[in-house]
């Protein structure tokens, strides 16, 4: 049980997908202007990461490895991600049409989010079992959500602040992201 907790804390804080592994930077910068869209994107991405971790483990363990088709891992995982994202899009369209409209183009772009493919490949490389894969996927989503929501709230405050003209927009966003990354480096010694 403590191994699962350490995996969760390690993935959320120490090995954060956005600030340490630099995965998922496109939605991190693109959806972080308003906190409402950031929260919606966080839920959708966490759901997709968790479900993709489980399904990609099953596909790898019970289809690709027994049939000796390991060379098709990347293509297989891309197909799994596309199916999971389409499923998520249909569920969100039925349950929350407002959020579906707010996310707009970013929802289908989850398919091309490198964090999701990176998660599937890292699960295989780190030799996680089924439960560890699900925990790893969920904690990657929680870490992504934490960083995205905090960053979007900081960007909202920065938009209302008096910032020198050369630093407005993307410049101050990159500086803020760098400072957040430095702050998360403080968790490095937390898990060994």
Swiss-Prot record:
What does the annotation say about its assembly with partners? The complex is composed of six subunits: RnfA, RnfB, RnfC, RnfD, RnfE and RnfG.
User: To which protein family does this belong?
Assistant: Belongs to the NqrDE/RnfAE family.
Q: Where in the cell is it found?
A: Cell inner membrane
Task: Provide the organism lineage as a comma list.
Answer: Bacteria, Pseudomonadati, Pseudomonadota, Gammaproteobacteria, Alteromonadales
* Protein known as: Ion-translocating oxidoreductase complex subunit A
Sorted UniProt keywords: Cell inner membrane, Cell membrane, Electron transport, Membrane, Translocase, Transmembrane, Transmembrane helix, Transport
Q: What does this protein do?
A: Part of a membrane-bound complex that couples electron transfer with translocation of ions across the membrane.
Q: Looking at the keywords, is Nucleotide-binding present?
A: no
Q: Which PANTHER family match?
A: INTEGRAL MEMBRANE PROTEIN OF SOXR-REDUCING COMPLEX (PTHR30335), ION-TRANSLOCATING OXIDOREDUCTASE COMPLEX SUBUNIT A (PTHR30335:SF0)
Q: Which domain of life is it from?
A: Bacteria
């Amino acid at each position: 049980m403590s191994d699962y907790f350490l995996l969760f804390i390690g993935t959320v804080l120490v090995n954060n997908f956005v600030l340490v592994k630099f995965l998922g930077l496109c939605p991190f910068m693109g959806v972080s202007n308003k906190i409402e869209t950031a929260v919606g994107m966080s839920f959708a991405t966490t759901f997709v990461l968790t479900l993709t971790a489980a399904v990609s483990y099953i596909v790898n363990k019970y289809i690709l490895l027994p049939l000796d088709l390991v060379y098709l891992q990347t293509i297989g995982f891309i197909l799994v991600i596309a199916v999971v994202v389409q499923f998520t899009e249909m569920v969100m369209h039925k349950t929350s049409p407002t959020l579906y409209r707010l996310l707009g183009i970013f929802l289908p772009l989850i398919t091309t989010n490198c964090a999701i493919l990176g998660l599937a490949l890292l699960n295989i490389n780190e030799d996680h079992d089924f439960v560890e894969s699900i925990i790893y996927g969920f904690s990657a989503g929680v870490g992504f959500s934490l960083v995205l929501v905090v960053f979007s709230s900081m960007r909202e405050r920065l938009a209302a602040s008096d910032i020198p003209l050369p630093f407005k927009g993307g410049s101050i966003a990159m500086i803020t992201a760098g400072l957040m990354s430095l702050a998360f480096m403080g968790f490095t010694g937390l898990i060994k």
